Amino acid sequence: MKYIYIKTWGCQMNEYDSSMIITLLEKNNQYSLTKSAENADILILNTCSIREKAQEKVFHQLGRWKKIKNNNPKVIIAVGGCVATQEGKEIFKRANYVDIIFGTQTLHRLPKMIDEVEKKRKLSIDISFPKLEKFKYFLAPKKKGYTADISIMEGCNKYCSFCVVPYTRGNEISRPCDDVLFEISLLAKQGIKEINLLGQNVNAYQGPTFNGKVCYFSELIRLVAEIDGIERIRFTTSNPLEFTDDIIEVYKDTPKLVSFLHLPVQSGSNKILNLMKRSYTTEDYTSIIKKLTIARPDIQISSDFIVGFPGESEIDFEKTIEFIKNINFDMSFSFIYSARPGTPASNMNDDLDLKEKKRRLYILQERINIQTMLWSRKMFGSIQSVLVEGVSDKNIMDLYGRTENNRVVTFQGSSKMIGQFVNVKIKKVHTHSLKGELF
């Protein structure tokens, strides 16, 4: 038996890809997963290029693994993910002890690439974009726990000026509807209760069906809701441009779809949205939220924000803060702008100093934290449906689970409840977590 060690950085899509890699290697090459890099025969780094200095982070990690390879030259080092797709053979030029470089769309070829390296002991590289080929090699991953991420589409056609996704994941491709439903059915039989549908632009999903028709995202959600055993549905990440009325209608008639939506806006200034090439305005975004609130009055919204984008004035930033207040976001992921090589925004004049960017980020995050706490306080005394995920790390007498709006809640109960939905009355609130008792 040989052992693989995999380190994963980045988004939920990368986590999903890593689970596919593990399943493929365990099946095809009879490898077993190890938690110790020092004990591994194959070291796999699944990378992310979304943030600043992503490339340097990769080489720092490879430098640490070089010591392992020096002690055991037979160890195979493989680099995959978005940095691998972006950098290609440049990785080998800086780290010539790397054996395999594979892309986001070629991870299914990893077993064959490993065989080649073991036989020939020379670099194997494949960062091509074969459409949907990797899903033809799909093996339902064995899931631990009661929630699962499911990739339904990949890539993006929007080419926002700051984003590398179209270059590292390719253009939008949707998995066949029947394949998605089959995978979810298998997971439901394993005891999975909650499904999170994944895509870089998930609501642009247009999956072909066995009878030659197209299944749109709204229809897919309804079909997933019909699968026995699936009790809760989430999705991420969506784009305002594709948030059409038929998707909003799903919130009216599909109670299994949670009353929580992550809908990235990036800025509250129309000028900055235009520079970002987001192709919508704050008015467009506000209209979507109003329609959603009518369809599902208790819905809560989270978002993404970039501060310090080239050209962002103090007035633009103030508009973003005002927009955050007006929409009343519950949560957000917020970052300082960092230029990504090869994107149009990387050629823009970025003259705002880092100190000012950090100040703006602090103000934005403080504003969001205030709103998050206010949303949490509204939950005090309420009865929440909670999917029990396990025993709390902080207190073995407590169980923990998540509410629809993605807050962790702890409460006392029997371990027999793990994997079940229970009603919990909220007795104590914190900004991002809750304390309750069975109701």
From Swiss-Prot:
Enzyme Commission number: 2.8.4.3
Q: According to its UniProt record, which cofactors does this protein need?
A: [4Fe-4S] cluster
Tell me the cofactor note.
Binds 2 [4Fe-4S] clusters. One cluster is coordinated with 3 cysteines and an exchangeable S-adenosyl-L-methionine.
**Residue ranges annotated for the Radical SAM core domain, each copy included:** 142-374
Report the subcellular localization: Cytoplasm
Q: Which PANTHER family match?
A: CDK5 REGULATORY SUBUNIT-ASSOCIATED PROTEIN 1 (PTHR43020), MITOCHONDRIAL TRNA METHYLTHIOTRANSFERASE CDK5RAP1 (PTHR43020:SF2)
Q: What is this protein called?
A: tRNA-2-methylthio-N(6)-dimethylallyladenosine synthase
Q: Which organism is it from?
A: Buchnera aphidicola subsp. Acyrthosiphon pisum (strain APS)
The lineage is: Bacteria, Pseudomonadati, Pseudomonadota, Gammaproteobacteria, Enterobacterales
